[in-house]
């Protein structure tokens, strides 16, 4: 009985248990009935021990302990295992050191290209980053500057935000693998409870959710996909909520039938390649080609040219870049349709303009597009330009109407067309369609608002760690700043000299009344400024070659930039601008190389403008500042004269 009790007792060391058993045997009663049940044979069997000094009962009861003690030898890593682990650690540390060194070198390298993200990524759960803690997290619609490729899974770059440093960016291959893993876990989660399924999807949802969940339908990113997604998301919701349970059987089937149609939206590429510097495009307050819109944008162009001198490229774009949609350029079957349409811009010309814009952006200078055909943000939403849309807004339609009427009968004739265009812009969702909305009452306030945004964007794209000059920019600067270069002397210096002589007579007669103000200009004057901007911007060697192509154009091809039909406004443009441009060019002599010049102003126009200004100024309330965009007479702009620094004249004669 004693031995049976000891066999049930907690296991102890073999030697200690043997001594305790001998003591207990001597103290136990001799005739115990419980001990009889085992018999002497059993007791003898238990007492005779094996070679390890343990009885059979000890072996069964102490098997766990004894095996653990034996495992104290077998669980120890051998010398080969230790050396292998040390080798792995050394290799890991060396790879991490090399990755850190490559990361430091990449800080001074130029930006290879830029991408816009279509997905969201969180680096919190990543454990395979080349340098732990150096992965970059981003949201959908963010912009990334990529310096170089590290390996197949990681790029080296930075998030285009102020204060963000260089790090590791997951490559499209890695994001695609993560998306597949996420889908597999989501499918597995369907077989578990809703709680576990929700946890699995949410943990990976922070890393790479589908772009449609974080992409507003009206945003500028891949409208084709998001439009379909909005339709897909709305229809199942309507099937689920209002339908009774009896129809719940049919709604999944209808959804499954629709899924192949929407299958392409689930494979949206994680990145879209965009220009390294997002081009700035002005829209509003109404249609380009009319005086109210042109004079307001002209004032902003002049301000930007002086405010960001040496850091900005202002270029004119005559081609209809709204045709440069990704779905069109990537689908050869649609090329013939575009070519057969009555558009003045061929796809080859459009593609050339897009490449030129990308090339300008490589210098990491601010790029401003003076685009003739862009009057609405939706025109560029499907392109790869990812522009900064600046909306020059007149909040009150009555004020815009009075401004249009103040420009004379020729502008009031097309009042309805301009008001409809302004109304279309006002209906756009502001946060999703525009990056900057200039609705200030004062010209200087609007200019400072735009300047503050562009300064912040400049700091975001030029971190302190990459202050070294851009090699491409340095090369183009060295080319464009040689005043005695024969090419530049013929293209810019000589033409500017001709412009000075051509303008001397008309300017001397009206300089006293014109110089104290920023006179509103017509379309041809506005475009001449942009062409001169392109010729004199720093760091745009590609732009000079493009200017030469502009110079080779005939007058008819240039005029086509302004008489291009914009939807249903074609007859208004032809009626208004063909005689206008012919009249101005008859009064102006052209230089030998074909540069467009600034047309002389008409005094009769100015006198009528004085009267219109007096009437208009009485009717305006809080929108007094719009005078600074248009009727710049007398004291309205004279106090800005010292700050403006003769913008009009400097734009054309400054070398």
Swiss-Prot record:
Gene Ontology molecular-function annotations: actin filament binding; calcium channel regulator activity; high voltage-gated calcium channel activity; identical protein binding; phosphoprotein binding; protein domain specific binding; protein kinase binding; voltage-gated calcium channel activity
Any single Gene Ontology cellular-component annotation: photoreceptor ribbon synapse
Site positions per UniProt: Required for CaMK2D-binding: 544
Biased composition (Polar residues): 62-81
Annotated Basic and acidic residues bias: 555-590, 605-618
Membrane topology, from the record: Peripheral membrane protein
Residue ranges, annotated region (Disordered): 34-107, 186-257, 483-632
PTM per Swiss-Prot/TrEMBL: Regulated through phosphorylation at Thr-549 by CaMK2D.
Cellular localisation: Cell membrane, Sarcolemma
SMART domains: GuKc
Residue ranges with Basic residues bias: 593-604
Function field: Beta subunit of voltage-dependent calcium channels which contributes to the function of the calcium channel by increasing peak calcium current. Plays a role in shifting voltage dependencies of activation and inactivation of the channel. May modulate G protein inhibition. May contribute to beta-adrenergic augmentation of Ca(2+) influx in cardiomyocytes, thereby regulating increases in heart rate and contractile force. Involved in membrane targeting of the alpha-1 subunit CACNA1C.
Protein's UniProt name: Voltage-dependent L-type calcium channel subunit beta-2
Organism: Rattus norvegicus
């Amino acid at each position: 009985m004693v031995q049976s009790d000891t066999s049930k007792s907690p296991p102890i060391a073999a030697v200690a248990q043997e001594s305790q058993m001998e003591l207990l045997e001597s103290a136990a009663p001799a005739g115990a009935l419980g001990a009889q049940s085992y018999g002497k044979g059993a007791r003898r069997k238990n007492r005779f021990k094996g070679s390890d000094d343990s009885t059979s009962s000890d072996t069964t009861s102490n098997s766990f302990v004894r095996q653990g003690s034996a495992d104290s030898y077998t669980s120890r890593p051998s010398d080969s295992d230790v050396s292998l682990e040390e080798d792995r650690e050394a290799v890991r540390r060396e790879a991490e050191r090399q990755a850190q060194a490559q990361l430091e070198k990449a800080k001074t390298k130029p930006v290879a290209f830029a991408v816009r993200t279509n997905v969201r990524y969180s680096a919190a759960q990543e454990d395979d980053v080349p340098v732990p803690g150096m992965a970059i997290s981003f949201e959908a619609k963010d912009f990334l500057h990529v310096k170089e490729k590290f390996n197949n899974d990681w790029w080296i770059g930075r998030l285009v935000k102020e204060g963000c440093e260089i790090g590791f960016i997951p490559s499209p291959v890695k994001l695609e693998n993560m998306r597949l893993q996420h889908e597999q876990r989501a499918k597995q989660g369907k077989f578990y409870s809703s709680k576990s399924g929700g946890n699995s999807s949410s943990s990976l949802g922070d890393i790479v959710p589908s772009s449609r969940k974080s992409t507003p339908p009206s945003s500028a990113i891949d409208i084709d996909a998001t439009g379909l997604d909005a339709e897909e998301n709305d229809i199942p919701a309507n099937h689920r909520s209002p339908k009774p349970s009896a129809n719940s059987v049919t709604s999944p089937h209808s959804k499954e039938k629709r899924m192949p149609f929407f299958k392409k939206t689930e494979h949206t590429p994680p990145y879209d390649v965009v220009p390294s510097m997002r081009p700035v495009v002005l829209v509003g307050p109404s249609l380009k080609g009319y005086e109210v819109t042109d004079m307001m944008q002209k004032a902003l162009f002049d301000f930007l040219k002086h405010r960001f001198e040496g850091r900005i490229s202002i270029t004119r774009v005559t081609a209809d870049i709204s045709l440069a949609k990704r779905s069109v350029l990537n689908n050869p079957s649609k090329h013939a349709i575009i070519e057969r349409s009555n558009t003045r811009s061929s796809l080859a010309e459009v593609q050339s303009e897009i490449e030129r814009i990308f090339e300008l952006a490589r210098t990491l200078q601010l790029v401003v597009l003076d685009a003739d055909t862009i009057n609405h943000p939706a025109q560029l939403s499907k392109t790869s330009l990812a522009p900064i849309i600046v909306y020059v807004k007149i909040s009150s339609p009555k004020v815009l109407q009075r401004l249009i009427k103040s420009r004379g009968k020729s502008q009031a004739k097309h009042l309805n067309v301009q008001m409809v265009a302004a109304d279309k812009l006002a209906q756009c969702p502001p946060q999703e369609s525009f990056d900057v909305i200039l609705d200030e009452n004062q010209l200087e306030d609007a200019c400072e608002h735009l300047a503050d945004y562009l300064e912040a964007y400049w700091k975001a794209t030029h971190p302190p760690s990459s202050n070294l000059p851009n090699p491409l920019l340095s090369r183009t600067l060295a080319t464009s700043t040689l005043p005695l270069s024969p090419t530049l002397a013929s293209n810019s210096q000589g033409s500017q000299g001709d412009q000075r002589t051509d303008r001397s007579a008309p300017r001397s007669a009206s300089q006293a009344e014109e110089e104290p103000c920023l006179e509103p200009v017509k379309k041809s004057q506005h475009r001449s400024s942009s062409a001169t901007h392109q010729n004199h911007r720093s760091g745009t060697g590609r732009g000079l070659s493009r200017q030469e192509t502009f110079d080779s154009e005939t007058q008819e091809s240039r005029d086509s930039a302004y008489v291009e039909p914009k939807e249903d406004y074609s007859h208004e443009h032809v009626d208004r601008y063909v005689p206008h441009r012919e009249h101005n060019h008859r009064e102006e002599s052209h230089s030998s190389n074909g540069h467009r010049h600034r047309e002389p102003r008409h005094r009769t126009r100015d006198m009528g403008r004085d009267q219109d200004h007096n009437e208009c100024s009485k009717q305006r309330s809080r929108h007094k500042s719009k005078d600074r965009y248009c009727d710049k007479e007398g004291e309205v702009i004279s106090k800005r004269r010292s700050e403006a620094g003769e913008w009009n004249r400097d734009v054309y004669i400054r070398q």
